[in-house]
UniProtKB/Swiss-Prot annotation:
Residues 1-42 form the signal peptide. Component of the multi-pass translocon (MPT) complex that mediates insertion of multi-pass membrane proteins into the lipid bilayer of membranes. The MPT complex takes over after the SEC61 complex: following membrane insertion of the first few transmembrane segments of proteins by the SEC61 complex, the MPT complex occludes the lateral gate of the SEC61 complex to promote insertion of subsequent transmembrane regions. May antagonize Nodal signaling and subsequent organization of axial structures during mesodermal patterning, via its interaction with NOMO. It comes from Canis lupus familiaris. This is BOS complex subunit NCLN. It is found in: Endoplasmic reticulum membrane. Glycans are attached at residues 241, 428.
Length: 563
């Protein structure tokens, strides 16, 4: 029998029986010679940044989940349930985002361009308006952001093509495509997020003491340094509020020089405060006020505060608005400062549209509108200077607020305008007859645009979300060192949330590594098992009935020879 089988196999390999031999040996040949997928196509590893997750005043915000292990789809797919939905920023809309959540998507990954400055302005504005809505909607769906690269773009395009083909095919084609198509399994390397205990929010203060007695009036200059956006690791906050901190540091430099000489040493104390937690209802300012007004007997804030000037988003545009909770009364120093701002803007910077915006404090709101409201609640005269007319403007809390959005010349001009108005108030120049069109800061005392640019570059070179600014990190140590060059009694203030009733809670797992593995669908294993079973069944049947197979082959050979 074995000799006969050998004869049959030998005959099958002859030219006349090549098709039959090809069929018999084809599966083995394919298994041996099929090239493996290149490593780059089989798997890709990239960094992802998770959406905000925090609690504020007991209210949860953002995504509540961090674990992801599901197959990728684009928003074009018919079925998104338990799938990782890939979206590009250029094609993103809030309606599509809601669609993914409504269909119980397993996760959402939004792919951002590498060069954010090249993104069209209408796309940036639309996404800025969308970010607060995304955060306001608490969800258990993990939401991640990734920066585009060639491999990730290829994954997106392949997934999009598969989703589009599946949507336009017939039912049979969809079934076949479902069973045989390649897909990508998206898997994160991290674990489930958990609350970060005892996280410290740090603020930095310094002062310039006025010349004269102990009961001198105090002018407080405030700006929060932290940034905010839909993803903490992508929050660089160039305009909000890198511009405010840059102006504060430049004012500290300018007035430290004026206070160095007795002839220009004014009879005002200047208190500079770089606050932390500004994007979380001004937690640093709130606790700083409590410590200075409730828990100490010697503080510049307790007696004779002339006014508090808060700086927020002053790095672009040709408008400046002085936001107040209560219009200043005539005869007060804050009213004099308002008039000086108007005069300097009109005579030295006519292109600037200056106005005062009056908005009462809404204590029913969980989050205050502007930082000056923290001071106004404690009955300290305060206002906020900003180029934004409304506190609801999306520019204040967006990952799109990058360095390119701050215009260096505009920032320098606004710094000079603020410095000129402050100087005219402090030295009472208007009453002394100095015309409003005569600049004070000239020659060696000029505003240094290079200095402002270097500070802006330093601030925007790192994410400054409150969850990421460590008390021992380089950001705070550099900020403290910078202020120490010009101010006296520079020190840090640390606060942490109450353990029993925390006002704020931060969570970890905000930055992870995601892997995209090329995989076949689960049904492909079933289809492959059926095919292998059928092939083995045919082979088994052929062996069991070899005599019949042998006779059939012989007849075919004889017939072929006679022809």
């Amino acid at each position: 029998m074995l000799e006969e089988a050998g004869e049959v196999l030998e005959n099958m390999l002859k030219a006349s029986c090549l098709p039959l031999g090809f069929i018999v040996f084809l599966p083995a040949v394919l298994l041996l010679v099929a090239p493996p997928l290149p490593a780059a196509d089989a798997a890709h590893e990239f960094t992802v940044y998770r959406m905000q997750q925090y609690d504020l005043q007991g209210q949860p915000y953002g995504t509540r989940n961090a674990v992801l292990n599901t197959e990728a789809r684009t928003i074009d797919a018919d079925v998104l349930s338990r799938r990782c939905v890939l979206m590009r920023l250029l094609d993103f809309s809030y309606e599509q985002y809601q669609k993914a959540l409504r269909q119980s998507a397993g996760a959402v990954v939004i792919i951002l361009p590498r060069a954010m400055a090249a993104v069209p302005q209408d796309v940036i504005r639309q996404f800025m308006e969308t970010e607060p809505e995304m955060l306001a909607m608490e969800t258990v769906v993990p939401v991640y952001f990734a920066v585009e690269d060639e491999a990730l773009l290829s994954i997106y395009e392949q997934t999009q093509a598969a989703s589009a083909a599946q949507g336009s095919a017939s039912a049979a084609e969809v079934l076949l495509h479902t069973a045989t198509a390649n897909g990508f399994q998206m898997v994160t390397s991290g674990v489930q997020s958990k609350a970060v205990s005892d996280w410290l929010i740090t603020s930095v203060e310094g002062r310039l003491t006025g010349l004269g007695g102990e009961d001198l009036p105090t002018i407080v200059i405030v700006a929060h340094y932290d940034a905010f956006g839909v993803a903490p690791w992508l929050s660089h906050g160039a305009d909000s509020n890198g511009s405010g901190i840059s102006v504060l540091l430049e004012l500290a430099r300018l007035f430290s020089r004026l206070y160095t000489y007795k002839r220009t040493h004014a009879a005002y104390n200047l208190l500079f405060f770089a606050s932390g937690g500004g994007k979380f209802n001004y937690q640093g300012t709130k606790r700083w006020l409590e410590d200075n007004l409730d828990h100490t007997d010697s503080s510049l804030l307790q007696d004779n505060v002339a006014f508090v000037l808060c700086l927020d988003t002053v790095g672009r545009g040709d408008s400046l608005h002085l936001h107040v909770s209560k219009p200043p009364r005539e005869g007060t120093l804050q009213h004099a400062f308002l008039r000086e701002l108007e005069a300097v803007a009109a005579h030295q910077f006519p292109e600037v549209r200056f106005s005062m915006v009056h908005k009462k404090i809404n204590l029913a709101e969980d989050i205050l509108a502007w930082e000056h409201e923290r001071f106004a609640i404690r009955r300290l005269p305060a206002f906020t200077l900003s180029h934004l007319e409304s506190h609801r403007d999306g520019q204040r809390s967006s990952i799109m607020d990058v360095r390119s959005r701050v215009d260096s010349k505009t920032l320098t001009r606004n710094t000079r305008l603020i410095a000129e108005a402050l100087t005219r108030v402090i030295y009472n120049l208007t009453e002394k007859g100095t015309p409003p069109d005569m600049p004070v800061f000239t020659e060696q005392m000029q505003i240094q645009q290079e200095q402002l640019d270097s500070v802006m570059d330093w601030l925007t070179n790192q994410p400054r979300a409150a969850q990421l600014v460590d008390k021992d990190g380089t950001l705070l140590s550099t900020l403290e060192h910078y202020l120490s060059r010009y101010l006296k009694e520079v020190k840090q203030h640390h606060i942490k949330a109450d353990k029993r009733d925390p006002e704020f809670v931060f969570y970890d797992q905000l930055k992870q590594v995601m892997n995209a593995y090329r995989v076949k669908p689960a049904i492909f294993d079933l289809l492959l098992a059926v095919c292998i079973g059928a092939y083995l069944g045919m082979a088994y049947t052929a062996v069991q009935h070899f005599d019949l197979l042998y006779k059939t082959v012989q007849r075919l050979l004889v017939k072929a020879k006679t022809q």
